[in-house]
Amino acid sequence: MITISKVTFRRFLLGQQGLWPGRRFKGLNGTSQAIHQMQGLQLDPLNSVARSQEIALYGRVLDFKLGHLYQAAYEKRGFFDYGGWLFMYPMQEFPYWRLHMKHREERGMHYEAFTHPPAELIKFVLNELRTRGPLGNRDFGGEAVQAWSYRGRKEASIALYYLWMIGEVMITGRKGFDRIYDLRERVLPSEYDYVAPESEAIDFFSRKSIAYLGLARESTWRTSLAYFIHRDVSRDESKKLLERLIKQGVASRVRVEGSKDGYLVLNSDQPHLSELEAGRIPKAWKSKGPTTEEEVTLLAPLEIVTARGRAKKVFDFEYLWEVYKPVHQRRWGYYTLPILYGDDLVARLDPKLDRKTNTLHILGFWLEDDAPKDEAFANALANGLKRFAELIGAKKMDLRGINHTKLRSYLKKKLK
């Protein structure tokens, strides 16, 4: 078992997610490549400055445009939206996800009114789609179910959601962020319209549970696998599956200095670890534009490397996404984003876009105690803010939320 340094640990996680040492994907094709590299892209409807998924792709794809995601997913049929935690996954994975969908159908739903929608309702919804074509929740009438759901309270809406979760319908596109559904056979490319054998699906998700995290703690790997296949995975089953992966030469165990946790890595990614430990950047990670030392990256709220406590574990950086907290309970701000400089998180800012005046307001800015305060960082911050403003269409910037006087003055000059 090899042991890697903490620096290698965080660089590997960032690099595997396509965030370091800079953007190595470009344009529309690069958008698809980035999502494949990420193993999946979490989607969120909130649009304070841009949606989380758009910010995630801005951080990985040079010349990313807001329309690229929907083009890659819905026009090119490269990805599908799925899950209680809404993600976009490569279309090639759909046959494996049919196992998850099968277990969803067996377990049913957890509404007070029903666990499985009435057969007559299912038949009605499917017939409407078949005869009328792609439809959204708003295209159906119907009675409200006596159980609140943010997905829609109409019976037809819940039936649509159920059919989507069991794989009978798919999201064919979106109006804004509203889902437009259609029958699976009219959305899914025919070469992927089959059910992978259960053993193959479990093997696939066993590997994906490692690839998704880059370096996965053994306990986290088991939890991820259980989510992917939508059933409990016992300790005994987990142990057998893991030992098989190791015996087959698919995965290995890794130690991180200073950590008691055991980690897993795919053997196909081992060369990257070796390069990083030797102080070299893997050739496959070569940036197509400025590096993160030359231009900071604003990280999306739902980034895998920072979400769910990983910011603290990996970077010793406290991060909370506080959009659902009352104002008086927020520590930082409504839509605060971490700032990546080099291979570390050094600051956070709370942005807001005024779409009437096309002004990006920085409502708050917080540097870490050990963050650099030199001209190189200030220049990288200016470059990062400029690219972010271009992404969201901001023509002006209001920097009054930056309380560091010298830094604010420098940025004003650079961003004229």
Identify the role of each PLM range:
Residues M1-K416:
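Long, charged, low-complexity, helical-prone intrinsically disordered regions
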